[in-house]
């Protein structure tokens, strides 16, 4: 027996040795999937298979490269070099270049990347004289991509009544015509996009059986990694290549199928043994990564799914501690709890910062944790994306803020003059820039007096520029007397940004909407903090001063020093960390509200949670309240917390997991007064008021009962209390309080008088704060 087989456990060895027909290897998290694939290929090479007769398909170039390197160490670099191993797209492009003439392309056809594809679609929309604010190129591109992934060509798309009705409902009925033109233009240009590499491979094999047989005969053994992530087109091509000889091994885990939004079809793996009746099923059930407790917790979670291939994952590692669940009072406190815990674990156990990850459901959640880590001096990085204040939509809004505070800001001016689109093109902008350079004045100065500075304009262009000038002038005038939070909302609404981002209801655009809302939430937090500290009129200039420092920090630290990783759970799949914090475990956040009542989507959300917790050490957290849509909302713990067997959780003392929404809402109404906080608006699901804003930006969100804390009346006389001093309106040193955003804390001292009466409070997670009682929102814990 080959020596390396001794390194495998019994289940792994059985999967490697079997090569008499189709096989499905279900590989649980941390079960040695890559090792099995690597050793299986090495075993095939050691048992008569030539390297060029083995096809191994992966989803990333990195996975293919690492696997090839491992194989080379087993069988030698020379033999490993000739393996057909790579991503679906790289392998199929290689085949298509060889056989291009059979489908009417040259061997040198161009491959369009996503940007090229989008640019062509944008040009076609313009040629068809369609409104690109309605027919957004990104949305059209996504629809065409989805059609191709289902092997639906332009004729089939046009003939589909269901698709046409969907496009009509989205007010983009001409997508089928755009798709046809796009298809034709790609062919005219001798070009394929990434999706075409799949489509044309399928067409090649379907229309030329002799070529299909050629490659099926060449690839005597086909292996596919991460089979649960394959789409319909990939699945069909695998069938084409393996139908004759049936030597195929697919590896994956249905419990980790989380990419349906990219076209992945879980049925491909669930129904594999139905398509290949003689297939053998192997289950890799030993987890080498996580503690026994985490494995059992994950098992108890995923067993709630109906559609799955049942398996009993186990671990022989240490038993481990129960998973700690942090119950934060607010989203702000949740960030502080996580930042403090990371700092604590690093100090006590000697972990490096890069051994920590904070996982969230949506990108917009990163802001809270970025700011908490910054305050704690903990370095971090955003994995696979930009930090909150570097995202395009955020920079667009900040540019408007900058222009309101300083209309002479050239970079902000250029960024927003035609965003949202208002018909002011580059030609007009360049005229303004040239005039400003010649006369050595600001762009704003030229905008106000174009004729004075020699800028010739048509009547229509002059009208558009005047409207933009009036818009900005209104913001400039408001800066000196309107609070930052209210003005921020006004700018986002009146500039047209809200209309622009809510006009596109696609899932692809949801992240932008959430980020804009989170920016305004952050402005509310900033104003509320400053108000409680005694600053009664916080202006946009104050907010921008703070944000400028944050964005400057974002551009620093591009070194390789260890950092905490912040990322969405979707981005985290396949990565390993010693310590993971899964945050925001609340209804209408995780599971995503977009899942609705669809059991299929809810099961995918549960699989997403399963992927998140299957790490070495795991911590979970949720917040009782979040500032959403312009008001403080009571949050319900995620149903997924109840799915986990409580024996494996270290739950908060208050059994909030089992409490119903109605009971919690009643309790909070009894405890708190009904005063509306200064920075809280009405009952609309959106924080943005006004007729031009969609009434319900997200129809699927049901506002929860508001969590309102009473304001403590200011003291009538001058005080300076100690633990033994008399109480002032019930507020004195030594008292425990519960604050709307900072949670539980103890009053250290009270000083000042009347409107200037302040309390110094040491909070469990937020540290020491000085609160102006006139504005502070907390209740005394009796």
At which residue positions do the language-model features occur?
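Short glycine-/polar-rich loops that comprise or flank the Walker A/P-loop
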Residues: 21, 49-53, 79-81, 120, ...
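Helicase P-loop NTPase motor core
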Residues: 25, 29-37, 100, 277-280, ...
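ATP-hydrolysis module of ASCE/P-loop NTPase motor domains
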Residues: 19, 80-82, 101-196, 219, ...
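Conserved phosphate/pyrophosphate-binding and hydrolysis machinery centered on Walker-type P-loop NTPases
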Residues: 9, 57, 85, 110-114, ...
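P-loop NTPase Walker
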Residues: 1-107, 111-112, 118, 189, ...
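Conserved helicase NTPase motor core
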Residues: 6-17, 21-25, 36, 55-56, ...
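C-terminal accessory regions
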Residues: 584-768, 775-782
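Conserved helicase C-terminal RecA-like lobe
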Residues: 168, 366-378, 391, 398-650, ...
């Amino acid at each position: 027996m080959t020596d390396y087989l001794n390194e495998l456990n019994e289940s792994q060895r059985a999967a490697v040795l079997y090569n008499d027909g189709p096989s499905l290897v279900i590989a649980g998290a941390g079960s040695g999937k890559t090792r099995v694939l690597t050793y299986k290929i090495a075993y095939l090479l050691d048992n008569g298979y030539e390297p060029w007769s083995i096809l191994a398909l992966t989803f990333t170039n990195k996975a293919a490269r690492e696997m090839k390197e491992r194989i080379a160490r087993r069988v030698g670099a020379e033999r490993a070099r000739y393996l057909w191993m790579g991503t679906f797209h790289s392998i199929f492009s290689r085949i298509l270049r060889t056989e291009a003439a059979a489908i009417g392309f040259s061997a040198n056809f161009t491959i369009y990347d996503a940007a090229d594809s989008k640019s062509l679609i944008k040009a076609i929309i313009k040629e068809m004289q369609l409104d690109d604010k309605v027919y957004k190129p990104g949305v059209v591109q996504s629809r065409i991509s989805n059609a191709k992934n289902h092997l639906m060509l332009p004729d089939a798309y046009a003939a589909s009544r269901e698709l046409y009705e969907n496009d009509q409902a989205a007010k983009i009925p001409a997508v089928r015509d755009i798709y046809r033109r796009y298809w034709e233009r790609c062919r005219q240009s001798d070009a394929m996009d990434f999706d075409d590499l799949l489509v044309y491979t399928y067409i090649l094999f379907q229309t030329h059986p002799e070529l299909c047989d050629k490659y099926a005969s060449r690839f005597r053994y086909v292996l596919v990694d991460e089979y649960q992530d394959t789409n319909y087109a990939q699945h069909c091509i695998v069938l084409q290549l393996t139908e004759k000889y049936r030597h195929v091994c697919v590896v994956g885990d249905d419990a980790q199928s989380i990419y349906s939004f990219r076209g992945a079809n879980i049925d491909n793996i669930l129904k594999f043994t139905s398509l290949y009746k003689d297939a053998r099923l192997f289950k890799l059930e030993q987890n080498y990564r996580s503690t026994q407790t985490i494995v059992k917790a994950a098992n108890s979670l995923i067993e709630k799914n109906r559609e799955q291939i049942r398996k009993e994952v186990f671990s022989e590692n240490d038993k481990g501690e129960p998973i700690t669940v942090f119950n934060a009072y607010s989203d702000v406190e949740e960030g502080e709890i996580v930042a403090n815990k990371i700092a604590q674990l690093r100090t006590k156990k000697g972990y490096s910062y890069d051994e920590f990850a904070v996982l969230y459901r949506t990108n917009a959640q990163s802001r809270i944790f970025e700011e908490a880590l910054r305050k704690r001096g903990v370095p971090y990085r955003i994995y696979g994306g930009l930090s909150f204040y570097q995202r395009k939509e955020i920079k667009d809004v900040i540019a408007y803020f900058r222009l309101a505070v300083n209309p002479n800001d050239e970079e902000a001016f250029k960024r927003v003059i035609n965003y949202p689109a208002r018909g002011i093109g580059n030609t007009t902008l360049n005229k303004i820039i040239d005039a400003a350079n010649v006369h050595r004045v600001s762009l704003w100065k030229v905008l106000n007096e174009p004729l004075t500075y020699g800028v010739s304009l048509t009547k229509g262009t002059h009208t558009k520029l005047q409207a933009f000038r009036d818009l900005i002038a209104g913001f400039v005038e408001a800066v000196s007397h309107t609070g930052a939070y209210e003005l921020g909302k006004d700018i986002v609404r009146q500039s047209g940004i809200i209309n622009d981002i809510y006009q596109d209801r696609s899932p692809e655009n949801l992240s932008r909407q959430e980020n804009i809302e989170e920016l305004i939430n952050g402005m509310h937090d900033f104003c509320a903090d400053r108000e409680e500290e005694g600053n009664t009129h916080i202006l946009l200039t104050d907010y921008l001063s703070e944000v400028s420092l944050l964005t400057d920090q974002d551009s620093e630290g591009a070194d390789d020093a260890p950092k905490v990783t912040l990322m969405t759970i979707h981005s985290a799949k396949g990565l390993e960390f010693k310590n993971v914090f899964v945050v925001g475990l609340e209804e209408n956040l995780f599971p995503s509200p977009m899942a609705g009542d669809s059991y299929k989507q809810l099961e995918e959300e549960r699989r997403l949670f399963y992927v998140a917790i299957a790490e070495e050490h795991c911590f979970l957290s949720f917040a009782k309240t979040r500032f959403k849509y312009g008001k403080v909302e009571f949050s319900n713990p995620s149903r997924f917390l109840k799915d986990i067997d409580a024996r494996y959780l270290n739950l908060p003392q208050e059994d909030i997991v089992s409490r119903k929404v109605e009971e919690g809402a009643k309790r909070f109404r009894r405890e708190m007064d009904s005063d509306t906080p200064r920075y809280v608006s009405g009952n609309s699901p959106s924080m943005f008021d006004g007729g031009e804003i969609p009434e319900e930006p997200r129809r699927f969100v049901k506002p929860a009962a508001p969590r309102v804390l009473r304001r403590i009346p200011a003291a009538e006389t001058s005080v300076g209390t100690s633990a033994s001093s008399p109480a002032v309106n019930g507020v004195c040193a030594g008292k425990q309080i519960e604050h709307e955003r900072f949670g539980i804390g103890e009053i250290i001292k009270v000083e000042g008088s009347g409107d200037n009466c302040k309390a110094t409070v040491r909070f469990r997670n937020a540290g020491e704060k000085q609160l102006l009682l006139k504005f502070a929102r907390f209740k005394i814990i009796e």
